[in-house]
């Protein structure tokens, strides 16, 4: 009996973020297109050979992308956004990046979260007359590359229903499903080309099956796949990120050769599929966690797999739960990590070995993997018994919290009056979201400090110089509420995690967020507490430089949770409450230091939502409680801000309002202020700062564009509750474009302020 091992996808960025380096050198015109193409090819080949060497029997092809796999899927079917005027059949590399990053004429495509992960995809744009045509050459070229290396390759495609669903209808209203026949025809041609090129299998991902879908979308699967299965390779329909058991009968009846199930997120769903599982289908068990970094309990997994192997025989395949895109590359490279903690970890490379071990155990018995099982069992018991995991003081503090302790003393209208009396802000106050450009000088100082080449005093002096520069530039621009610029911060989560008990950090545990943007999530391995203040000295120094209010800047508890690799031995709610209390200590210390505007960023609050409606109320209740716990006890005159991005809020606005932040800033420019309709219908009660320009693009907005967005905002939000700000932090931009964009933003804000005064 043999069980094939395969991957749904592999980290694109490389062991040392080679893709990031390639992209950024190309964008700076240090590499030409040929060098970029060759570098990407070499990276793909290195990854395929690594997988082959680790025993992976079917490697994914087409999961690699220069920017985003959803954008690539659009281009495979010839559907570049119409507003750019590009011919998808003759798209240049430069035009590809213009879609993702914008150009002088068109803003970049909208970007949003990939389901409940911290990866961002570019949102497809559909029009009623969108036409599709198969453009298979990129995929065929990569298939040829893999086969030339002797790699057994499995092309990977984002499925047509998911691609269509993930996009937005543009122009006149229409039903996106009206585009499905043309889209399916293009997919048929793609699949036919793959079959003709010798592909035995093709993986088609339909992650939307883990969502609450309307009947019309569900009903579209059977006829679509009836068409797709003709003249195609064997199709493996992949689902992930959640439970699809309610669709078991439908999925088992589809004319595909196999199904992939996420048995990490939803292990119980297997019971809905095993009865009467079709004899002509393989079942791919997503048994190794593709999204977290903890070492697998191999003994327990073998116990779960044994009955599946007995029933299915060779038709049982082994795989990670989802693409390893969401996993860091290689834990073996973490030479500076505590050895005990390192022994608990498995990154992408280690997960390949776990698959190989499980395969050997199923095929040859546990005695064949006795050493691996012993190591796995030891790591599990070592972690369970480790005294570093539990802090009794944290547990006592949580248990002692009185009921209702997360509520502000007074309602928003009273707080707003007291805050205005203290802050004396003009109408339409201008501010930024927090970070300013991380210049080469800043990065060099931080690197030198971490290497011991720069003393603590020297580092503080360098950072204070950058803070003063940021304050002076903001004063010159005329902003009303200033920020210190976060020069001292490497990452909005890592910075805090480095100073909190219960966190650990890797040197190379990077994962892709979007394009060349990578993040290095901290590891929450134990109880969380704040040993000492984290931001107070920097904020106090910044405030000493100016008479204008300076915001204290914190990352919120839900975002720290969502953007970390979280311990799996405690409910996420409890971990989040621990983080909230640690942050509350910081908030109260900031207030005591004279900081009267404190921003608690929660850009990730929506991505924590369960993908299905069941369970969302429970999540939103504890997420809201955690946010309020983090700001509990502050004076009415202290203004609490929060920031959220890449989100659709319509269905969770009551929960957002329940956070009771005095000011919420949101990312809206890429969606042309579409989010504001939701806020208007809901009559959001507190102040709002909708982003007036897109910081993810190097393009500097015109005053006319900013004015148009603010005019839209003023139709929905009363002027006395409207703030003027960019979409997000400015860390990744350069100072010339930042100053130009902010100057335009401040000028438009003042212009509208004068109009309001005249109208009054």
From Swiss-Prot:
Positions that bind L-homocysteine: 433-435, 486, 601
Residue numbers binding 5-methyltetrahydropteroyltri-L-glutamate: 17-20, 113, 517-518, 563, 607
Residues binding Zn(2+): 643, 645, 667, 728
Keyword flag Magnesium: no
Enzyme Commission number(s): 2.1.1.14
GO MF annotation, one: 5-methyltetrahydropteroyltriglutamate-homocysteine S-methyltransferase activity
Active site residues per record: 696
UniProt pathway annotation: Amino-acid biosynthesis; L-methionine biosynthesis via de novo pathway; L-methionine from L-homocysteine (MetE route): step 1/1
Reaction it catalyzes: 5-methyltetrahydropteroyltri-L-glutamate + L-homocysteine = tetrahydropteroyltri-L-glutamate + L-methionine
Keywords: Amino-acid biosynthesis, Metal-binding, Methionine biosynthesis, Methyltransferase, Repeat, Transferase, Zinc
GO BP term, pick one: methionine biosynthetic process
Cofactor: Zn(2+)
Catalytic EC class: transferase
Keyword NADP: no
Pfam families, A to Z: Meth_synt_1, Meth_synt_2
Residues annotated to bind L-methionine: 433-435, 486, 601
Cofactor note: Binds 1 zinc ion per subunit.
Function per UniProt: Catalyzes the transfer of a methyl group from 5-methyltetrahydrofolate to homocysteine resulting in methionine formation.
UniProt xrefs under NCBIfam families: met_syn_B12ind (TIGR01371), PRK05222.1 (NF003556)
Record HAMAP family: Meth_synth (MF_00172)
UniProt-recorded name of the protein: 5-methyltetrahydropteroyltriglutamate--homocysteine methyltransferase
Organism in which the protein naturally occurs: Chromobacterium violaceum (strain ATCC 12472 / DSM 30191 / JCM 1249 / CCUG 213 / NBRC 12614 / NCIMB 9131 / NCTC 9757 / MK)
Designated gene of the protein: metE
């Amino acid at each position: 009996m043999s069980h094939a091992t395969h991957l749904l996808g592999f980290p694109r960025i490389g062991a040392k973020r080679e893709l990031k380096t390639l992209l950024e050198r190309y964008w700076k015109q240090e590499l030409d297109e040929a060098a970029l193409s060759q570098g990407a090819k070499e990276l793909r080949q290195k990854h395929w050979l690594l997988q082959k060497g680790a025993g992976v029997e079917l490697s994914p092809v087409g999961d690699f992308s220069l920017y985003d796999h959803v954008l690539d899927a659009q281009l495979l079917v010839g559907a570049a956004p119409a507003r750019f005027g590009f011919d998808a059949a003759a798209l240049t590399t430069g035009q590809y990046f213009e879609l993702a990053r914008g150009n002088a004429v068109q803003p970049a495509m909208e970007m949003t979260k990939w389901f409940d992960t911290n990866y961002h995809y570019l949102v497809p744009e559909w029009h009623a007359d969108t036409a599709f045509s198969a453009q298979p050459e990129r995929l065929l070229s990569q298939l040829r590359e893999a086969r030339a290396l002797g790699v057994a390759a499995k092309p990977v495609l984002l499925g047509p229903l998911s691609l269509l669903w993930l996009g937005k209808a543009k122009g006149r209203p229409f039903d996106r499903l009206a585009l499905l026949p043309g889209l399916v025809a293009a997919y048929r041609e793609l699949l036919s080309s793959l079959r003709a090129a010798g592909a035995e299998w093709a993986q088609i991902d339909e992650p939307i099956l883990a969502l609450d879908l309307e009947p019309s979308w569900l009903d579209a699967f059977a006829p679509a796949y009836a068409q797709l299965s003709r003249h195609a390779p064997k199709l493996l329909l992949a689902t992930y990120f959640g439970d699809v058991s309610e669709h078991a009968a439908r999925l088992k009846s589809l004319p595909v050769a196999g199904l992939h199930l996420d048995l990490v997120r939803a292990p119980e769903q297997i019971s809905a599929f095993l009865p009467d599982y079709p004899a002509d289908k393989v079942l791919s068990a997503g048994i190794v966690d593709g999204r977290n970094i903890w070492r697998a309990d191999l003994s327990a997994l073998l116990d779960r797999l044994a009955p599946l192997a007995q029933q299915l025989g060779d038709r049982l395949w082994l795989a990670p739960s989802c693409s390893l895109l969401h996993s860091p590359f290689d834990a073996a490279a973490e030479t500076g990590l505590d050895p005990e903690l390192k022994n608990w970890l498995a990154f992408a490379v280690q997960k390949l070995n776990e698959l190989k071990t499980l395969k050997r155990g199923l095929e040859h018995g546990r005695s064949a993997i006795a050493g691996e099982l012993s190591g796995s069992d030891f790591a599990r018991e070592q972690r369970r018994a480790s005294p570093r995991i539990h802090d009794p003081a944290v547990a006592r503090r949580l248990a002692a919290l009185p009921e209702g302790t997360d509520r502000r003393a007074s309602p928003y209208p009273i707080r707003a009056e007291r805050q205005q009396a203290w802050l004396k802000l003009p109408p339409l106050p201008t501010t930024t979201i927090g970070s300013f450009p991380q210049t080469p000088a800043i990065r060099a100082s931080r690197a030198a400090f971490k290497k011991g080449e720069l003393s603590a005093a020297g580092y503080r002096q360098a950072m204070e110089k950058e803070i003063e520069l940021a304050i002076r530039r903001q004063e010159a621009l005329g902003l009303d509420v200033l920020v210190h610029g976060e020069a001292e911060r490497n990452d909005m989560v890592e910075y805090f995690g480095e100073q909190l008990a219960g966190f650990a950090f890797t040197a190379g545990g990077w994962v892709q967020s979007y394009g060349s943007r990578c993040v290095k999530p901290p590891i929450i391995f134990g109880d969380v507490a704040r040993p000492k203040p984290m931001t107070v000295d920097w904020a106090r120094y910044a405030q000493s430089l100016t008479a204008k209010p300076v915001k204290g800047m914190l990352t919120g508890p839900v975002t720290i949770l969502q953007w970390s690799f979280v311990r799996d031995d405690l409910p996420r709610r409890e971990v989040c409450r621990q983080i909230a209390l640690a942050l509350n200590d910081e908030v109260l210390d900031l207030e005591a230091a004279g900081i009267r505007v404190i921003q608690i960023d929660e850009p990730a609050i929506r991505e924590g939502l369960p993908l299905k409606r069941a369970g969302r109320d429970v999540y939103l209740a504890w997420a809201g409680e955690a946010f309020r716990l983090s700001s509990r006890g502050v004076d009415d005159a202290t203004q609490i801000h929060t920031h959220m991005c890449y989100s659709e809020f319509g269905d969770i606005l009551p929960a957002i309002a329940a956070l009771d932040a005095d000011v919420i800033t949101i990312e809206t420019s890429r969606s042309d202020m579409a989010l504001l309709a939701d806020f208007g219908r809901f009559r959001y009660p507190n102040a709002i700062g909708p982003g007036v320009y897109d910081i993810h693009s190097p393009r500097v907005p015109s005053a006319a564009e900013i004015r148009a967005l603010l005019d839209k905002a003023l139709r929905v939000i009363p002027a006395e509750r409207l703030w003027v700000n960019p979409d997000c932090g400015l860390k990744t931009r350069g100072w010339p474009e930042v100053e130009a964009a902010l100057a335009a933003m401040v000028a438009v804000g003042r212009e509208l302020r004068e109009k309001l005064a005249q109208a009054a």
